[in-house]
A protein has these predicted regions:
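Active-site PLP attachment segment
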Residues: 226, 232-267
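Active-site phosphate-binding strand-loop segment of PLP-dependent enzymes
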Residues: 56, 158, 162-214
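Conserved PLP-anchoring active-site segment centered on the Schiff-base-forming lysine
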Residues: 124-144
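Substrate-binding/gating loop at the entrance of the active-site cleft, primarily
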Residues: 115, 137-153
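Conserved N-terminal alpha-helix of the aminotransferase class I/II PLP-enzyme fold
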Residues: 67-115
């Protein structure tokens, strides 16, 4: 059997990626105890570096409380969860984590996924299946995971100009008031760091009878009195149908989630393939995430300091 055909196709794709300067090289990193100091592998040695590109925004991956709780959980539960949520993977730390996330966002229920990407792709895909003949309204700068979820069922969609409420309303006005509509947006956009117009979207959703879905991955842990994100800061949590977030950035662990009411979460857990057909998060990850959420709810110093640092650096850069 000649495999050269397949080798050529793979090599051609890599050549194309390299010509477009999209080929990625991974850096081997060894974290130090003091974030953001680290070491990078270089010619069989490690050299000291300062990390500017991490999404461990507050250094919570090295938080002593989170590490302590993870170690205790490891002793009590072992390493893996041992199954999907439908069989033996719904362990106590995961149940408590979902309770904590629901409480954080002032929602009835939360569901934890293996990543933020999976949370978006699976939930949006499930929604467009459940809401028959639905139409999506998506900000043009939404994340790849959102785009993938929208494409999953090839539903009808409108892409509105970034943060442009006039354009969004013009598109909403074209659709029958009784047709299912889902507005999907981010609270902080990874493409340019802009803040989403949450209040504007909430107002339009009420006017045009639309379901709202906000991605808060860059905001949870970072904004709001208890670290629940921009929706908390603007007191809009009760006006947004689904709040999606991650445990992998400010909370310093891994995993993604949605928070909503009982009915929504029950429907998603029963239909979203990315939730159903995969092994759940390990207990020690769930418990360390709980510790991070607990810490950031009652300690605002880290996020205040981070915002002060951002302001200082921005001002210094503007001088040069």
């Amino acid at each position: 059997m000649n495999k050269q055909l397949y080798k050529n196709l793979l090599a051609n794709e890599l050549t194309k990626i390299k010509k477009e300067n999209r080929y990625r090289i991974f850096n081997e990193i060894k974290k130090d105890d003091s974030f953001p100091l680290a070491k990078k592998a270089y010619k069989n040695k490690f050299k000291d570096i300062l990390i500017w590109c991490s999404n461990d925004y507050l250094g919570m991956s090295r938080n002593k409380l989170s590490i302590k709780r993870a170690k205790e959980c490891l002793d009590n539960y072992g390493i893996g969860s041992g199954g999907t949520r439908n069989i033996s993977g719904t362990h106590s730390p995961l149940v408590r984590l979902e309770d904590d996330l629901a409480n954080l966002h002032c929602k009835q229920k939360a569901l934890v996924f293996t990543s933020g990407y999976v949370a978006n792709e699976s939930t949006i895909g499930a929604l467009t299946t459940i809401f028959k003949d639905s139409i999506i309204f998506s900000d043009e700068k939404n994340h790849a995971s959102i785009i993938s979820g929208i494409k999953k069922n090839k539903c009808e969609k409108y892409i509105f100009n970034h943060n442009d409420m006039i354009d969004l309303e013009n598109k909403l006005s074209l659709v029958d008031i009784n047709r299912p509509k889902i507005i999907i947006f981010e609270s902080i956009y990874s493409m340019d760091g802009s803040i989403g117009d949450l209040a504007g979207i909430v107002n339009l959703s009420k006017k045009y009878n639309a379901f709202t879905y906000v991605d808060e991955v860059h905001a949870v842990g970072m904004y709001g009195k208890t670290g629940a994100g921009i929706s908390e800061k603007l007191n809009l949590q009760n006006n947004i149908d689904i709040i999606q977030g991650t445990l992998a950035k400010a909370f310093g662990t891994i995993g993604g989630y949605i928070a909503s009411d009982d009915l929504v979460c029950d429907a998603i857990r029963s239909t979203a393939s990315g939730f159903i057909f995969t092994t759940s998060l390990p207990p020690l990850v769930a418990e360390s995430a709980r510790a991070s959420i607990e810490y950031l709810k009652s300690n605002s110093e880290l996020r205040i300091k981070q915002q002060e640092n951002v302001k200082f650096l921005k001002n210094e850069l503007l001088k040069h």
